[in-house]
Amino acid sequence: MKNVDLVIDLQFGSTGKGLIAGYLAEKNGYDTVINANMPNAGHTYINAEGRKWMHKVLPNGIVSPNLKRVMLGAGSVFSINRLMEEIEMSKDLLHDKVAILIHPMATVLDEEAHKKAEVGIATSIGSTGQGSMAAMVEKLQRDPTNNTIVARDVAQYDGRIAQYVCTVEEWDMALMASERILAEGAQGFSLSLNQEFYPYCTSRDCTPARFLADMGIPLPMLNKVIGTARCHPIRVGGTSGGHYPDQEELTWEQLGQVPELTTVTKKVRRVFSFSFIQMQKAMWTCQPDEVFLNFCNYLSPMGWQDIVHQIEVAAQSRYCDAEVKYLGFGPTFNDVELREDVM
């Protein structure tokens, strides 16, 4: 059954994945929402009434009116404290009829130890330094005496997550029982470990194939990929690496905009001109069906319409049939427009 819609970032992150995930969840009424987040990324959604969610653990799709399951994949790295905070903040949505399932092989973050292990790279490569990489490395070491790294083991002595951690069989059965699934990717394609910006990158690939694997979703279940992009791509502040040869680094003053801050570290973001080359590479690897172009409010109608055209030309040049379907003009549900309504 092809019933999984996957949201994925086509640039360097911070393109509005949280916004479009919340928007689609409210519009389409998915019964299951799933992700494999790490603490190095935050996802924000503001609904039509102005209520705000900033998640580092839970999917933003929990706002779906038909919600039955919230699932955290094996590729997740999460803080138990943060998970509890997010559940408490949305307890009106996560009622008794909603099941929260944590994959037994999800990684549990030791906030103090794992963050401390990343102090050096936080400055040398512009990492957020939240401990994601250190936690993953500890899991990869596969120490049979370590009972503090995967959710299955931690649940044996930490009752806060014991009720949520399932077996692999229960995980698979939950996916099979789902009617419509919204899967939420994190970070951005160009931050992928195996793309060209290594070592100024994240600790995994940010592609559809990787996220489906991290969520335990079989490939035949994929219905469509919704790619997200912004008119002016950003990178985190500091020594966060280079950019594509057809783009230049800009200033927020040049754009006439208040400087944006990163969701997690609150650093001023670096901002760039749009890259056709970046979009070609993302289209080839990610093969989105639909695109959400965000931050159109930073440009005139002629400006963002030109970028819409560039995105679709880039797609066609890489054997991809993607169309720009959604446009973002601000941070809330009310600021998302269907392209057909404004062009």
UniProtKB/Swiss-Prot annotation:
Annotated protein name in UniProt: N6-succino-2-amino-2'-deoxyadenylate synthase
InterPro entries per record: Adenylosuccinate_synth_dom1 (IPR042109), Adenylosuccinate_synthetase (IPR001114), P-loop_NTPase (IPR027417), Phage_PurZ (IPR046383)
Gene encoding the protein: purZ
Origin species: Vibrio phage phiVC8
Protein's UniProt keywords contain Signal: no
Residues given in the record as L-aspartate binding sites: T263, V264, R269
Enzyme Commission identifier(s): 6.3.4.25
Keyword Secreted set for record: no
Co-factor requirement: Mg(2+)
